[in-house]
UniProtKB/Swiss-Prot annotation:
Keywords: ATP-binding, Nucleotide-binding, Nucleotidyltransferase, Transferase
Segments crossing the lipid bilayer: none
A GO MF label: sulfate adenylyltransferase (ATP) activity
Protein name per UniProt: Sulfate adenylyltransferase
EC number: 2.7.7.4
SUPFAM superfamilies, per database record: Nucleotidylyl transferase, PUA domain-like
CDD domains assigned: ATPS
Length: 402
């Protein structure tokens, strides 16, 4: 019997993907249905429901649940859920009771079918204010919400495809069933998830190694879905992480894998979502550092820590491993934190993925205080392949300029 944390909201994963003859029959039927084009974010959510990553959801949220999640971070049933999972359309023709085919807006491939249980309109500004704490269009999450269609469609779904994630990422792309089987095979009971949309710099390595000391293992879990302009692509990031694991971690303490969601950049609320679906993947802990899932200056550096203090004790089984500021200290001669380093600010070099990207985009060398040389080499090769006119200007937020 597995000793891992249970899936969210119950004792079993609830993947919504069809297989075998059922899959083939549903695909044939879907070809005849009215199509709903899905954004990259919606596609990621569909695939996540398909593999059980969003257990126990059975489809896209209705108006009551959208409102409850925005306002209370719970569904109408009382189930904890921090961010609305919704599907939108501009179609005037779709009505309650219709069965529709959900297609990838970029490829037109059919990825799911849905029976529409409700068609409703939302106050997009309300969702932005409650989830993202802003309605400014400079926030990429706000842009996503404001770009949604006029109506939301609710209903249960049947998932018919993983998109191109298995083909593109191979063994790096793992489902919750697969990670749970891996952990069980290793005999791990406690696993810390390390969420990353960046290559791992020295501070990241430091946090992961502390987690290895605390837990049986660490899952370095990379975003494989969409990111904002200027972020490093998943294949490059994965290669950089692989060389770090190979050269600087003990064998059989780390699992590197990825998941299909787009980043929402919702800061504290997204940290809660990250913990929730890591529970479904079998992780007992989520590493939460500075400005988790944040963007620019929209959230304080430890807002994602504090939000775990205000949710109900039984909201999640997976708990946060909270870490203070980490940095390179010249006097300590290595990575330290506010809790371990007694020295002054002039002795410290603050590290961030944003700063790493800024240095590389300006064709500068990464100092060893920032990055292991093997990691730096992978990233330098990638940035050297980008034409100067195609590079995105990277700006540091106030957390690093004050």
């Amino acid at each position: 019997m597995s000793k891992l944390v249970p899936p969210h909201g119950g004792d079993k994963l609830k993947p919504l993907a069809l297989e075998g003859n059922s899959l083939m029959a549903e695909l044939e039927k879907a070809k005849l249905l009215l199509k709903v084009s899905c954004s990259s974010r919606e596609v990621g959510d569909i695939i996540m429901m398909g593999i059980g990553g969003f257990t126990p959801l059975e489809g896209f949220m209705d108006n009551v649940n959208w409102q409850s999640v925005c306002d209370n971070m719970t569904m109408s049933s009382g189930l904890f859920w921090p961010i609305p999972i919704t599907l939108s359309t501009n179609s005037e023709d779709i009505k309650q009771g219709d069965e529709v085919a959900l297609v990838n807006g970029e490829t037109d491939d059919i990825i799911a079918t849905m029976v529409v249980s409700e068609k409703y309109s939302i106050d997009k500004s309300h969702e932005c204010n409650t989830v993202y704490r802003t309605t400014e269009m400079a926030h990429p999450g706000v842009v996503m919400v404001m770009a949604q269609g006029k109506y939301n469609l609710a209903g249960s779904i049947k998932v018919l495809s993983d998109g191109n994630f298995p083909e593109k990422y191979g063994s790096l792309y793992m489902t919750p069933m697969e990670t749970r089987a891996y952990f069980d095979d290793k005999g791990w009971k406690t696993i810390a998830a390390f969420q990353t949309r960046n290559p791992m710099h020295r501070s990241h390595e430091y946090l992961a190694k502390i987690a290895v000391e605390i837990c049986d293992g660490v899952m370095i879990h990379s975003v494989l879905g969409g990111l904002k302009d200027g972020d490093i692509p998943a294949d490059v990031r994965s290669e950089a992480i692989s060389v770090l694991i190979k050269n600087y971690f003990v064998d059989n303490t780390i699992l590197q894998s990825g998941y299909p969601l787009d980043m929402r950049y919702a800061g504290p609320r997204e940290a809660l979502l990250h913990a929730l679906f890591r529970q479904n993947y079998g992780c007992s802990h989520l590493i939460v550092g500075r400005d988790h899932a944040g963007v620019n200056d929209y959230y304080g550096p430890f807002d994602a820590h504090n939000i775990f203090n205000v949710i109900a004790n039984d909201a999640l089984v997976t708990k946060a491993l909270k870490f203070d500021w980490t940095f390179w200290c010249h006097k300590c001669g290595g990575i330290s934190s506010m809790r371990t380093c007694p020295h002054n600010s002039e002795d410290r070099v603050l590290l961030s993925g944003t700063e790493v990207r800024k240095i590389l985009s300006e064709n500068k060398e990464l100092p060893e205080t920032f990055s292991r040389p093997e990691v730096a080499k992978v990233l330098q090769v990638y940035y050297a392949s980008i034409k100067d006119e195609d590079k995105i200007e990277i700006k540091l937020n106030d957390h690093f300029t004050k």
